[in-house]
């Protein structure tokens, strides 16, 4: 059956190549184009939940990027006093946030369906399944991330999606099913994120911030910066510009040659998220998006003369 062959080829051969790609728009649009074809195989009994979860998560990226552009235009127009333009851009942004969030909710639901069918596992509840394949672990990670992204887009849209608020605690529990070391410290960063966003006490929140920073440090060692994006998301939600600046600096400080080439696509996705936060922060403070490079060198940071220059001046 062609559907089963397509599934096998996609998971065993195409996916590893896709994960090594740094061309996010190509991957995004390819997922948009292939989605209906994959859906059509469901009626013939082909297992499509995994492919659809990955595909919808990927397809949401371009829509979310368009939403960010509208948000920036709205902020800029508002600063210029162009009220109608600002309002129109904001409405367009909310609709795009809705569309991106719907895709992400569907990606999460396909993840939930996959683990229910294959392992009889209710996502984020009870005992973790004994996952057999690495690609299934990746699916769990991507599905959980999609749910959190959907929640962000829901809020940004003005709750046009109405994402179930019972999902975040399930995500925390599901992250415990993944090996934190194997997956670059990202599972712990997600757990720490929700500790900070919904803290049980001031002490728990303080520890959550430390855990987020520790996750970024571990990610730097193994060449993956997903935890940096989590750190930035939480800093933005909590309105902590000090932590946002720290997250941006940590992210930019990692040399490109250290990035894990086998998962370059995931790092590029994190890069897009960080660029979005940098653009928002610069727009809010300076009235334009972040510089093309060195966006974590902020406008209020004075250039410090080098020790060598100081020595030369002392000898004059």
Identify the role of each PLM range.
Residues 49-56, 188, 192-195, 228-231, ...:
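TPR repeat positional signature
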Residues 60-64, 151, 195-199, 235-236:
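Generic structural signal for hydrophobic core residues of well-folded globular domains
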Residues 180, 184-218, 235:
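Alpha-helical adaptor scaffolds
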Residues 186-190, 224-230, 260-266:
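Alpha-solenoid helical repeat scaffolds
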Residues 209-250:
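Glycine/small-residue-rich hydrophobic helix-like segments
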């Amino acid at each position: 059956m062609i559907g089963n062959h397509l599934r096998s080829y996609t998971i065993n051969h195409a996916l590893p190549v896709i994960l090594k790609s740094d061309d996010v728009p190509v991957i995004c649009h390819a997922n948009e184009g292939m989605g209906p074809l994959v859906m059509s195989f469901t009626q013939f009994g082909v297992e499509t939940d995994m492919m659809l979860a990955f595909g919808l998560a990927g397809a949401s990226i371009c829509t979310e990027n368009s939403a960010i552009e509208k948000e920036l235009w709205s902020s800029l127009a508002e600063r210029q006093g162009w009220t109608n333009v600002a309002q129109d851009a904001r409405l367009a942004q909310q609709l795009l946030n809705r569309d991106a969030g719907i895709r992400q909710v569907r990606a999460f639901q396909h993840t939930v369906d996959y683990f229910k069918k294959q392992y009889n596992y209710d996502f984020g509840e009870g005992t973790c399944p004994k996952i057999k394949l690495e690609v299934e672990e990746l699916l769990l990670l991507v599905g959980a991330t999609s749910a959190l992204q959907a929640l962000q887009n829901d809020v940004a849209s003005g709750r046009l999606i109405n994402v179930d608020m019972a999902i975040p605690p399930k995500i925390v529990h599901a992250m415990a099913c993944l090996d934190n070391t194997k997956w670059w410290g990202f599972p712990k960063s997600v757990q720490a994120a929700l500790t900070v966003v919904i803290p049980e006490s001031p002490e728990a929140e303080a520890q959550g911030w430390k855990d987020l920073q520790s996750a970024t440090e571990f990610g730097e060692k193994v060449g993956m910066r997903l935890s940096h994006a989590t750190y930035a998301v939480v800093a933005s939600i909590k309105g902590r510009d000090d932590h946002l600046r720290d997250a941006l600096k940590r992210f930019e400080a990692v040399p490109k040659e250290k990035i894990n080439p086998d998962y370059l696509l995931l790092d590029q996705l994190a890069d897009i998220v960080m660029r979005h936060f940098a653009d928002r922060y610069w727009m809010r403070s300076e009235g334009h998006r972040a510089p093309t490079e060195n966006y974590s060198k902020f406008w209020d940071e004075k250039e410090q003369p080098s020790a060598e220059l100081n020595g030369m001046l002392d000898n004059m």
